[in-house]
Amino acid sequence: MTKVLLSHPPRPASHNSSRAMVWVRKNLFSSWSNSLLTIGCIWLMWELIPPLLNWAFLQANWVGSTRADCTKAGACWVFIHERFGQFMYGLYPHDQRWRINLALLIGLVSIAPMFWKILPHRGRYIAAWAVIYPLIVWWLMYGGFFALERVETRQWGGLTLTLIIASVGIAGALPWGILLALGRRSHMPIVRILSVIFIEFWRGVPLITVLFMSSVMLPLFMAEGTSIDKLIRALVGVILFQSAYVAEVVRGGLQALPKGQYEAAESLALGYWKTQGLVILPQALKLVIPGLVNTIIALFKDTSLVIIIGLFDLFSSVQQATVDPAWLGMSTEGYVFAALIYWIFCFSMSRYSQYLEKRFNTGRTPH
């Protein structure tokens, strides 16, 4: 019996290294200009990153309670640790801050079921949540009844106030902006003209002017002895201002839909509101998810303008802490911390927007 010996060729070496070299050559050194730009970026990172790491981590001061404890040449993160409560809660009484934490916990727990795919009556649940949860938050934070000590809104501040203004602003501006977008495309001249006037007026006025008018000028036109809380006036101004931008974003989605969608709804004998609610708006809102999230991110960052009317959000609380004589010279650490918080929230919203785009396949336009 003859034995046949089969010789197997050696396995080819891994192509990972060669693929990496091809990618580097194609994307970083494909031309002289690209090579110079790559080398310049490498040099810039070499010059900036090591000193930054040295300042932020290696030579940073982490332990202590006063400015005198910051003896190293790096960042004084002791300042952030000692003023963290002010950055998060503003001037809210220290012994009452558990109320804010409880409101946040209730919000997180109650929002979680909205992401369940098997949640029955999802629409009713969201509608009930939108009505009940703000009342719970107001009761917990403001108090004044049911054995809770009253805490005036002038004591609210920090990241808490930033989140309140941003969330209430977009929650109020979204439905109002949708109505304005529908009104601007209405066949009724009066409705269309009024919608156009409202949108163009608020789009032509800076937000800082709106806040100033709501806080300083509005009380001059009110009856003597009548007063409205400063935070309420600011929230109303933010909602009116932001609704104009939401309206234009939604109008872009409405214009992107082909006429066939309207004709299909008419063939089913659907009325105007059923057509908009069941056929048009779901598709239009799906198309403008990036624009809506961009508007939300812009509003979140614009909350820092409330300092003009004496409200101290996150950024204003950091500024207030840096002028404290006990912590002079800590402005860099404070602004870096504030920038990091803003970046975390804005980046998270941006990533969630990308998730929604992929989930709803916003790249496809209905035919």
Curated annotation (Swiss-Prot):
Q: How does it sit in the membrane?
A: Multi-pass membrane protein
One GO cellular component this record assigns the protein to is: plasma membrane
Cytoplasmic membrane side = 1-36, 121-125, 184-192, 255-291, 348-367
TM spans, by residue? 37-57, 100-120, 126-146, 163-183, 193-213, 234-254, 292-312, 327-347
Q: Which UniProt keywords apply?
A: Amino-acid transport, Cell inner membrane, Cell membrane, Membrane, Transmembrane, Transmembrane helix, Transport
User: Which InterPro entries does this chain map to?
Assistant: AA_ABC_transptr_permease_3TM, ArtM/GltK/GlnP/TcyL/YhdX-like, MetI-like, MetI-like_sf
PROSITE patterns per UniProt = ABC_TM1
Kindly list the places in or outside the cell where this protein is found, as annotated in its UniProt entry.
Answer: Cell inner membrane
Q: Quick one: where is this thing mainly located?
A: membrane
Q: Which residues lie on this side of the membrane: Periplasmic?
A: 58-99, 147-162, 214-233, 313-326
Q: Which GO terms describe its molecular function?
A: transmembrane transporter activity
Q: Which residues form the ABC transmembrane type-1 domain?
A: 159-353
**GO biological process, alphabetically ordered:** amino acid transport; peptide transport
Family, similarity comment: Belongs to the binding-protein-dependent transport system permease family. HisMQ subfamily.
Q: What does this protein do?
A: Probably part of the binding-protein-dependent transport system YdhWXYZ for an amino acid; probably responsible for the translocation of the substrate across the membrane.
Kindly provide the name given to this protein in its UniProt entry: Inner membrane amino-acid ABC transporter permease protein YhdY
Could you tell me which species this protein originates from? Escherichia coli (strain K12)
State the gene name recorded for this protein.
Answer: yhdY
